[in-house]
Amino acid sequence: MNKFFSFPILGLLLTCVRFVVAKERLFEWNVTDVYDVDPDGSGNSRWVIGVNNKWPIDPLVVDYGDQVIIKMTNSLANNRTTSLHSHGLFQKFTPYMDGVPQSTQCEIPPGATFYYNYTALQNGTYWVHSHDMSQYPDGLRTPFIINALEEPYDYDEEYIISMTDWYYTPFNILVPDEFKTWKNPTGAEPVPDTGLFNDTANATFAMEPGKTYRLRFINIGAFNNYDVMIEDHNMTIIEVDGEYTEPQEVSSIHLTVAQRYSVLVTAKNSTDRNYAITAYMDESLFDTIPDNYNPNVTAWLSYNSDASYDLGPDIDEIDSYDDAELNPLYSWDVTESNHSINIWFDFFTLGDGANYAEINDSSYVFPKVPSIMIANSTNVDGYNLEPVTYGPYTNAYIFEYGDVVDVIIDNHDTGKHPFHLHGHTFQVLERGEENAGLYSDQESHTYYDNPMRRDTVEIEPGSFIVIRFIADNPGAWVIHCHIEWHMESGLLATFIEAPEMIPSISSPDFVKEQCMLDGVPTIGNGAGNYKNISDLSGAPSPPGEMPAGWTSKAIGTMAACVISACIGMGSIIFYGASIHPVPTEELDENDDLQEAALENAAMFLDTDKAVEKVVEGKDEIK
């Protein structure tokens, strides 16, 4: 289909499709805390966030064209808000359903109910998760499958296989106490305690000889990448991130946080044994590796429940492949880009002593008004066409409808980062190898033919990536690193797409009423000012830069240290120089020890006189 097809006509056609094939699929979610959960059987029980007092949360499964309604009631304890993002869905014509607080909606306050209501206009493997306060690593996430009306590949059965890193301590404790604190100025991310398949240990998937299975792998974790292998089985990739690919046979797949793969696996004819599915954690992401740490997670293809579940031989090296070499099954006929932006990111310690991410020298902070409502309410005199209107730290970029945009992302950091763009899939035009340097450092650039499309892509350390998308989806779409620690650090930007068209798809009244319950304004600029849109005073901002040189506080601290050191040295000198003779009758076989002690005391003294005093003391003792 021509990507520049008329927006109104496309909307009419999609509406017609809904009348032909749509079913209403209502999911009633009461979001609750669930206690005493021990998914790996280690004895490390903790609370999690579940649905209807249950965890793990059942996957959502619908068909293409269905009307999806998630009635989400916030019953969390301790006055916590929440939200729900359908990861990978474009939300065409419903951008206010994307579930990102202060971007497309307001948080769902305690006791309130919000209806996520949209049409499933894609098919493939997705997931839903909270986009609020690091809640999804604490359990508020589950796979979301949209079945195609007609599948391009044949298979007999399918399994959904989620994988996640798991922490025994909840994130609402880890973030303030161990990560985003002056005690962690380098931003070292807490290492997961373990990993899980389908939120449990030793998950099994029954196999029947000769059948072909579609395995939908989804990394719903917070931090870690996984390399996945199936013992003595090859896999054929047919889908990544909701995009069908040309078939590619591989021995392993690499999933960053938020990525998805569908692979076909044909079962063996023999049932004399079972085979391990092993996910290997990418330990290069960890600043430190705990003693006796097990980086591997295991599930099983079960051919015979009476046979043993024995691990095969250890793997010395994983035969990896470059996912950028994958080709989409349905190619895009995309013209050259007419718009290009270059963003870079790195991490810095700011004025509060904690570590923050910055995109082009700016750490993301939520605006006072949700970005999509800023675009809607400042549509006068061209204010909604100016990035600064959305807040000085919203990292906003403006695109016109139909722009073909190249986004060059330079990674100044020493770690890998999975970047995700809401509202789109994108072409991966070029990706530099590890430590290749910046995009501008390269002597030449060669873009892939029929490049892979997906919504989450990994950027190598000290390197770059080039992605291309078409700005055909009016709305406010965040682009961010999907490592949860880095989202907490501010590694986000906002793409404001076709702002002049956003008022025509304005947020419904019930979305705005949700903001009123939250006490959040729905009109104005990023500072919440609507009478004078150019006035950004009071806009939220990150901590200031770490002061250079000696501040008064630092001087005072150093002075206190020097005074304490002088007092300590003075005490040593005073007591060392005031040694009194010991009566001879008290000397015994410990005399040598006493001499050694006196000699050690003399090491702390700087003057010859003091040393002589110690020697005299020794002579008097003798």
From Swiss-Prot:
Q: Which GO terms describe its molecular function?
A: copper ion binding; ferroxidase activity
Q: Where does Cu cation 4 bind?
A: 417, 481, 486
GO terms for CC?
high-affinity iron permease complex
Cofactor info, note text = Binds 4 Cu cations per monomer.
- Extracellular membrane side: 23-553
Q: GO:BP terms for this protein?
A: cellular response to iron ion starvation; reductive iron assimilation
Instruction: Report the leader peptide range.
Output: 1-22
Question: Residues in domain Plastocyanin-like?
Answer: 49-147, 194-304, 386-498
Recite the UniProt keywords alphabetically: Cell membrane, Copper, Glycoprotein, Ion transport, Iron, Iron transport, Membrane, Metal-binding, Oxidoreductase, Repeat, Signal, Transmembrane, Transmembrane helix, Transport
* Cellular compartments annotated: Cell membrane
Glycosylated residues, chain numbering: 30, 79, 117, 123, 198, 202, 234, 269, 296, 338, 360, 376, 532
Binding-site residues, Cu cation 1: 85, 420
Q: Which cofactors are named for this entry?
A: Cu cation
Return the InterPro entries for the record.
Cu-oxidase-like_N, Cu-oxidase_2nd, Cu-oxidase_C, Cu-oxidase_fam, Cu_oxidase_CS, Cu_oxidase_Cu_BS, Cupredoxin, CuRO_2_Fet3-like
In the bilayer, the protein is annotated as: Single-pass type I membrane protein
Provide the binding site for Cu cation 2: 87, 129, 482
Q: Which residues lie on this side of the membrane: Cytoplasmic?
A: 575-622
Q: What does this protein do?
A: Could be an iron transport multicopper oxidase, which is required for Fe(2+) high affinity uptake. May be required to oxidize Fe(2+) and release it from the transporter. Essential component of copper-dependent iron transport.
The family this protein is said to belong to: Belongs to the multicopper oxidase family.
Q: What is this protein called?
A: Iron transport multicopper oxidase fio1
Q: Which gene encodes it?
A: fio1
